[in-house]
Amino acid sequence: MSKFTEDKLEQAFIELLHEQEIIHQNGKELIRHESDVLLQEDLREYLATRYQSQNITESEIAQIIRTLENYPSSDLYDTNKTIMKLVSDGFIFKREDANEKDIYIELIDYETIENNHFKIVNQIEITGYEKRIPDGILYINGLPLVVFEFKSAIREEATIHDAYVQLTTRYKRDIPELFKYNAFCVISDGVNNKAGSFFSPYEFFYAWRKITGNEVDVDGIASMHSMVQGMFNQERLIDIIHNFIYMPDKSKKEEKIVCRYPQYYAAKKLYDNIRLHQKPHGDGKGGTYFGATGCGKSFTMLYLTRLLMKSVHFSSPTIVLITDRTDLDVQLSSQFSNAKSFIGDDGIVSVESREDLREKLRGRESGGVFLTTIHKFTEDIALLSDRANIICISDEAHRSQINLDQKVKTTKEGVKKTFGFAKYLHDSLPNATYVGFTGTPIDATLDVFGDVIYSYTMTESVRDEITVKIVYEGRAAKVLLDNNKLHEIEEYYEGGGDLAVLADIGFES
């Protein structure tokens, strides 16, 4: 049996990517300057074809390429953030001829996959401060968006952590230009296969264990197949780059969050289910997401919010994020208010009171992300909006956000009928679609929000090292008692608990 070396692992990935119709080219065959990290001819060809109808010129294409190359690698995080924004959201390009209309440029065609050029390149020599040869680089339209680094599983001294260090230390130091364009990285030894942000600590690299989201999660060699077929399916790959890589508006740390597979599949399936159940044609039950505690549900909400806000179908919806505790509200408010660029809406605000909520929602026709607590919905809240493009996303949807039933209370004034907070919420926004996130799904949750659309179990979370496993070990406590004392205690209880009995038998309390 032949050894599974790094070269063979590299070839295995190339073959699996080829099955996804990603063509292979050896880096030694490319005609390029050794310091170039862009495949300029691929990018030039894509832009010329895509914008031919707008009569884009060669000099304008050269200007776009020059603009990308001129971003400095010395400030790598900020440059990567800028370029990722250009890649994910596109940009307006001002024409050389002032009489020509500006062009909205997309570096990736997200609507028509066939218009993009996917290419996996190995053995490409890149000269920066030193010469380096990454194991693999996946290009889309000439942009080096994914970098692969492999280690052999049969070499005990080499691990995928070494691959991580190779990327984030040696390559970062010697060829930083490559990582200006990087969406994410993959480290693998064939058995352990993980993806993550170039700026993330090693522990935030994760496996991609499912292909479509419906299978049982896999491990070992099978996880290499699930990663390539799941993450590098062309449609999913550009969707991840488009909608599922989050960089905060402001950050003291170099934060870049690449979605994990449960976050991706949950957000996508919830989005589809919201469309299906949206009023007036649906029942307004957008679905329930069941996720293990600590599994990153808030990021799933963030990705879902971007999908909804960028959707043509929903026509710039209004999103209402509802929690049942002030600390959760503060946490979500902090996260979402720092994601205005990612979500694509500057109107992300925390609602301070019932009156504030009424003022912000009444008369609004579109847009806005409002964060509030369920307790602000009481019986004095009248109709706020009858629009159907309002989406209410509830966190901890198994608690106070499901109490729709009537309650009868007897007071000094007589019998009073009241309802739970959820009833007043639904009355205030009768045509909204409601989505529930919970770590404890109960029947009442499903009655209000609809069926579980996606679940990420505690077992899966532990396997992915998101949740730490806690094991209870039962033990019988060892108790040593003097037999004479036991006899004295028995006499005490036989005497009806009389303290005098204890005194008679000489028991010292």
What are these regions (language model features)?
Residues 326, 348-358, 373-379:
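Conserved helicase motor
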Residues 143-145, 179-183, 315-317, 388-389, ...:
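Short glycine-/polar-rich loops that comprise or flank the Walker A/P-loop
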Residues 385-433:
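SF2 helicase catalytic motif II
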Residues 186-188, 370-372, 392-393, 433-438:
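Structural recognition of the conserved hydrophobic beta-strand(s) that form the central parallel beta-sheet
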Residues 155, 328, 376, 399-402, ...:
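Residues immediately C-terminal
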Residues 217-218, 446-509:
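Interdomain helical connector at the RecA1-RecA2 junction of SF1/SF2 helicase-like NTPases
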